[in-house]
């Protein structure tokens, strides 16, 4: 049985923020959510989140998560924090202790650490740093770990040690039940250090087995916004590398932001400053221009999305053409070879095969058939101030420029709407619809003159 404890009670003073540090984001998701995702991948039987500063905000942020909240009302150190969880632990379980502000530790690293745990051993995640300043040092005797000494308590010889404690450890819950109540706060900080259980473990002949991450960034925590930005770039670089290995061309890998997951087919090209949110799937040979934002959308093979376009919860079939400056809002569904041009907005709109909405239009709550042409400035008037209604435009229809289609309304198959019309009644197949005031030309009219 595996239980995970996540320390998330700290105030994060150096973030200079009104919200708890663990709720600040990496790739659009709170640090704490990243740690919880790793917990889920490890198939933890129970996850305990220690909260303190901003406890209500953390509870609200994790409202959909199956976690046990344990509140640390006084901030008396990491050992004191874990002590609060002790009554909730199964004495037969293995316990993995993680930190809510260390978001990039890999699942494989944690699984390796957990494997170190037995009745006669515990696991400790360490790392060797060129600059260990600020970290607790790993003290070894004849190669075996015997203690962790915090920076402020270290002597000159111990300060030379470059192997440092990451804070992440795995241990039998029964051992924690023995060691935690025996912790002392007789140190420079006057706090109860979780790291003091290492010396207790050594004294009880419980071997301390160490593991190290493949990459140093896995154990980097966040204490300020500069470090937050550094981790963001590390994360985004990883995503960029994965996309390029998968066969995508990134015109500048340093200018990509993924805030969710992205799946790419072969020969995709992604230009600079694109943002991907939620779950995004790109087919083969998809080209995305600069400065696009794509959220929770599926893009079919051969589709081209030009610069400065925004897509949200939309589905595009193959060989569509979007933008520049197009906005597809949730519920937009495009069949193959459909085109949405510049300064066009769609919402809950089904656009048929080969249909075109090329310029300056709004298409909302609409179903458009195949081979339809929507002229510039066309508006589907879908909202009467209370209710939304649907516009239906059947196959082959032609909508002239600057037309307003007042829903609910249907334009028949192969019908034509004259430019500037306000359409309020249904039409049948092949109709010509003209709904505008008759033009008058007044001969000899003189412009007014200033008096």
Swiss-Prot record:
Pfam family, one: Hexapep
Region entry N-acetyltransferase, spans: 247-451
Keyword annotations of the record: Acyltransferase, Cell shape, Cell wall biogenesis/degradation, Cytoplasm, Magnesium, Metal-binding, Multifunctional enzyme, Nucleotidyltransferase, Peptidoglycan synthesis, Repeat, Transferase
Reaction it catalyzes: alpha-D-glucosamine 1-phosphate + acetyl-CoA = N-acetyl-alpha-D-glucosamine 1-phosphate + CoA + H(+); N-acetyl-alpha-D-glucosamine 1-phosphate + UTP + H(+) = UDP-N-acetyl-alpha-D-glucosamine + diphosphate
Ligand binding (UDP-N-acetyl-alpha-D-glucosamine): 7-10, 21, 72, 77-78, 99-101, 136, 150, 165, 223, 329, 347, 362, 373
Residues that, per the record, bind acetyl-CoA: 376, 382-383, 401, 419, 436
Enzyme Commission number(s) of this protein: 2.7.7.23, 2.3.1.157
SUPFAM superfamilies according to UniProt: Nucleotide-diphospho-sugar transferases, Trimeric LpxA-like enzymes
Cofactor binding description: Binds 1 Mg(2+) ion per subunit.
GO BP terms: cell morphogenesis; cell wall organization; lipid A biosynthetic process; peptidoglycan biosynthetic process; regulation of cell shape; UDP-N-acetylglucosamine biosynthetic process
Residues that bind Mg(2+): 101, 223
GO cellular component: a single term: membrane
CDD domains on file: GT2_GlmU_N_bac, LbH_GlmU_C
Cofactor(s) demanded: Mg(2+)
Subcellular location: Cytoplasm
InterPro entries referenced in this protein's UniProt entry, alphabetically: Bifunctional_GlmU, GlmU-like, GlmU_C_LbH, Hexapep, MobA-like_NTP_Trfase, Nucleotide-diphossugar_trans, Trimer_LpxA-like_sf
Chief subcellular location: cytoplasm
Pyrophosphorylase as annotated region, ranges: 1-225
Active site: 359 (proton acceptor)
Keyword check for Calcium: no
UniProt cross-references to NCBIfam families, sorted A to Z: glmU
Role played: Catalyzes the last two sequential reactions in the de novo biosynthetic pathway for UDP-N-acetylglucosamine (UDP-GlcNAc). The C-terminal domain catalyzes the transfer of acetyl group from acetyl coenzyme A to glucosamine-1-phosphate (GlcN-1-P) to produce N-acetylglucosamine-1-phosphate (GlcNAc-1-P), which is converted into UDP-GlcNAc by the transfer of uridine 5-monophosphate (from uridine 5-triphosphate), a reaction catalyzed by the N-terminal domain.
Quaternary assembly: Homotrimer.
Family the UniProt entry places it in: In the N-terminal section; belongs to the N-acetylglucosamine-1-phosphate uridyltransferase family.
Protein known as: Bifunctional protein GlmU
Source organism: Saccharophagus degradans (strain 2-40 / ATCC 43961 / DSM 17024)
């Amino acid at each position: 049985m595996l239980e995970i404890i996540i320390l998330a009670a700290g105030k994060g003073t150096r973030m200079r923020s009104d919200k708890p540090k663990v709720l600040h984001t990496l790739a659009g998701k709170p640090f704490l959510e990243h740690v919880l995702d790793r917990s889920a991948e490890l198939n933890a039987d129970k996850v305990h989140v220690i909260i303190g500063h901003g406890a209500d905000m953390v509870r609200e942020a994790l409202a959909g998560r199956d976690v046990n909240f344990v509140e640390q009302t006084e901030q008396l150190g990491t050992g004191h924090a874990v002590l609060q969880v002790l009554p909730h632990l199964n004495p037969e379980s293995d316990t993995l202790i993680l930190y809510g502000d260390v978001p990039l530790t890999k699942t494989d690293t944690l699984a390796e650490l957990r494997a170190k745990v037995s009745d006669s051993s515990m696991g400790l995640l360490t790392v060797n740093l060129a600059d260990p300043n600020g970290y607790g040092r790993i003290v070894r005797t004849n190669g075996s770990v015997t203690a962790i000494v915090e920076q402020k308590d270290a002597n000159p010889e111990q300060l030379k040690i470059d192997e440092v404690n990451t804070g992440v450890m795995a241990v039998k819950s029964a051992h924690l039940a023995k060691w935690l109540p025996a912790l002392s706060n007789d140190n420079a900080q006057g706090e109860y250090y979780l790291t003091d259980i290492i010396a207790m473990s050594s004294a009880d002949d419980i071997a301390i087995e160490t593991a190290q991450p493949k990459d140093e960034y896995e154990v980097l925590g966040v204490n300020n916004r500069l470090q937050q930005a550094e981790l963001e770039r590390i994360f985004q670089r990883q995503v960029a590398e994965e996309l390029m290995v998968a066969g995508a061309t990134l015109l500048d890998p340093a200018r990509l932001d993924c805030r969710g997951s992205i799946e790419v087919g072969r020969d995709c090209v992604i230009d600079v400053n694109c943002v991907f949110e939620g779950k995004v799937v790109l087919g083969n040979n998809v080209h995305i221009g600069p400065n696009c934002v794509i959220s929770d959308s599926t893009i079919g093979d051969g589709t081209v999305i030009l610069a400065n376009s925004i897509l949200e919860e939309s589905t595009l079939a193959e060989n569509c053409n979007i933008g520049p400056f197009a906005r597809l809002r949730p519920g937009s569904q495009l069949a193959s070879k459909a085109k949405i041009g510049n300064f066009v907005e769609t919402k809950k709109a089904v656009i048929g095969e080969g249909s075109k909405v090329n310029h300056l239009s709004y298409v909302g709550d609409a179903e458009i058939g195949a081979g339809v042409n929507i002229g510039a400035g066309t508006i589907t008037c879908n909202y009467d101030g209370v209710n939304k209604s649907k516009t239906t435009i059947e196959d082959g229809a032609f909508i002239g420029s600057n037309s307003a289609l007042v829903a609910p309304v249907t334009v028949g198959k192969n019908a034509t709407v004259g430019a500037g019309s306000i359409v309020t009644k249904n039409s049948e197949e092949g109709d010509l619809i003209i709904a505008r005031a008759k033009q008058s030309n007044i001969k000899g009219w003189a412009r007014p003159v200033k008096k």
